[in-house]
Design a protein with these regions (language model features):
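N-terminal active-site segment of His-dependent metallophosphoesterases
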Residues: 1-50, 58-68, 74-76, 81, ...
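Structural signal for conserved beta-strand scaffold positions within catalytic alpha/beta enzyme cores
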Residues: 6, 52, 81, 129, ...
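Active-site glycine-centered loops adjacent to acidic/histidine catalytic or metal-binding residues
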Residues: 9, 33, 55, 83, ...
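Short active-site segment of divalent metal-dependent hydrolases/proteases
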Residues: 12, 36, 86, 114, ...
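Short, small-residue-enriched loops and turns at beta-alpha junctions
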Residues: 59-61, 88, 136, 165-166
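Active-site donor-binding loop signature of nucleotide-sugar glycosyltransferases
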Residues: 74, 84, 130-132, 149, ...
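Conserved beta-sheet core of the metallophosphoesterase superfamily
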Residues: 89-153, 157
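Short, solvent-exposed aromatic-acidic interface loops
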Residues: 157-169
């Protein structure tokens, strides 16, 4: 059994709560738009395995260090991890053929800043977009996802909302 922490779209923003929520995870997956290599370094200090892909805002250093897509198997579950993927019925160009060829049980992407955990009946997989963990973007709630994989199946998914403390701005 493995616990996997999933995040995306940090856009160089680090929140110490990533470490708090992911401290008991066996792996952490970052679905791109990392922003700063230090984010990956900090995640590597939390979990023994970190898998990450670069996103459309990531610069040359991250593009040299990471790939745009990772395909791997963990605890019997085949996974495709990428940044721009779309969602069931509306996949980005090239993704449908990749899913056809790879036949994963789990497809993880980011980019939209929209949290989605939905089954894709056409490809017989679970689609997860963890939403955005960073502050850049239009999302109103920052999110992380933790899943449990056991004996070749995703057993559960937990959504974590990272509520920001209210600011004490003076009223005018």
């Amino acid at each position: 059994m493995k616990r996997i922490g999933i995040l995306s779209d940090t856009h160089s923003y680090w929140d110490d709560r990533y470490a708090k929520y992911f401290e008991h995870c066996d792996e952490i997956w970052h679905a791109g738009d990392i922003g700063d290599e230090a984010i990956i370094d900090r995640l590597e200090a939390i979990a023994p395995v970190v898998r990450a892909v670069y996103g459309n805002i990531d610069g040359a250093n991250l593009r040299r260090r990471l790939r745009p897509m990772e395909i791997f198997t963990t605890d019997g579950v085949k996974v495709v991890l990428t940044h721009i993927g779309g969602y069931p019925g509306h996949y980005a160009p090239g993704i449908r053929s990749r899913l056809d060829i790879s036949m994963p049980q789990l497809f993880v992407d980011g980019h939209s800043h929209i949290l989605k955990i939905i089954p894709d009946r056409e490809f017989n997989l679970l689609h997860i977009n963890p939403g955005a963990a960073g502050k850049q973007g239009w999302q109103t709630v920052r999110t992380l996802v933790i899943i449990t994989i056991d004996a070749g199946a995703v057993k559960d998914a937990e959504v974590i909302e990272l509520a920001d403390p209210p600011t004490n701005k003076p009223r005018r």
